[in-house]
Amino acid sequence: MPFEFSPLKLVYGGEALGYAEGRTVLVPRALPGERLEVESVRVAKGVVHAKPLRVLEAAPERVSPPCRYFGRCGGCHYQHLDIEHQVAWKSEIVRETLKRIGKIAWEREIAVHQASPWNYRNQAQLKVVQNESGEVALGFFEGESHRLVPIDECLILSPRLNQVLGQLRQPQWLGRLRGCREVELLANEQDNQVRITLFGNFETGEPEPLAGDLLSQVEGVVAVAFCDGQRTRVFGETAFTYRVGEYQYQVSAGAFFQSSRYLLPEFVTAATETAPGDIALDLYAGVGLFTLPLAQRFRQVIGVESHPAAARDLEANVRSHGLKHVRAVGQPASDFLRRFAHKEPDLVILDPPRSGVGKSTLQYLIDLRPRSVHYVACHPPTWARDLACLLSRDYRLEGVEMFDCFPHTYHIECLARLVRQD
């Protein structure tokens, strides 16, 4: 049954939170201060998840979403909110998360870095769905579902990725994607070269003919990779590269790389900026986004990465830049820290996955007693949890920064700078 709802605030996850009849209510595409008519969709752990039916009284910061798929496609969450208020709310969410989860009352400024709000993504994960009649569709899933929304363009993808997407949606290509479950597109920093990675088991035979046709007929495509869960085969340019500042990074199919192109140089500078020293560790290093720039400031740098493809790229990137004082280590951060003998490194950079660092790895890190820790995170809740652990063990929080790398979504990149208190 529909009921009236007035949200109080936005929360991490892209929804608006409020209360009705003593129960917590979460509603997407709603704004604080509005009056809406909503309807319950489900109740989980005592929280009512509802959908908006009508806006009865709109907030002044509400805008008309420019994307015709907004509200169905699960990619964006805030296109109904003007960009200034998006950034303000994200900053408040970072502060509130520190307080609620980390019990950290950060009263000082949160430095905010903003990206251009459109065409900023250099990467897309497109879903492929085949219906009962055998027709293949390409697009994004609806929020919290596996229902496909076929799309012609995405306003947050780079122009080149939109061009490739438009071509792949043509019938001659869709029919050749049977057996594929996901198509990943990655554009380089100039947005003039694209790698297509196809995930799945293909029903159309060997991949060479499809790869050859994609390379020759889709403008901008320079590499095509096929991943079937057992192995990865690459056609075209086997070493796809992405330049950030003065460094060129090899990024293999399956290796993680930042997907927001506009803030990358600023992001790298902020994470690596520190006084010169002897030893720096870059844990969860990926392909070496922070590892290589650290080489300018430290006599010895060690990048640690456990993902096989990313670890190989890390080693290749260190080697290609001739950095003799930089070492690439392919193992989990916890294993490396447990065996690392050099106490008190000058700097440790943490950039873990959404799950965070975790207790045991944090304990190994604390035992190592680094002088400074820069903690980069894409998931504020686990970031705040881990920061609380560090702050309870002789570390002081010196600064907090927020990077709005993904406008119109709830996603946030955070940076915390900590120093050891002797």
List where the protein language model places each region.
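Short, solvent-exposed loop/turn elements at beta->coil junctions and helix N-caps
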Residues: 110-117, 182-186, 227-231, 401-405
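Rossmann-like S-adenosyl-L-methionine
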Residues: 4, 12, 16, 175, ...
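A short, glycine/Asx- and small/polar-enriched loop/turn
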Residues: 118-122, 190, 410-411
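Terminal RNA-binding accessory module
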Residues: 1-69, 145
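Hydrophobic beta-strand signal
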Residues: 37-39, 125, 281
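Short beta-strand micro-motifs enriched in acidic
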Residues: 39-43, 127-131, 186-190, 419-421
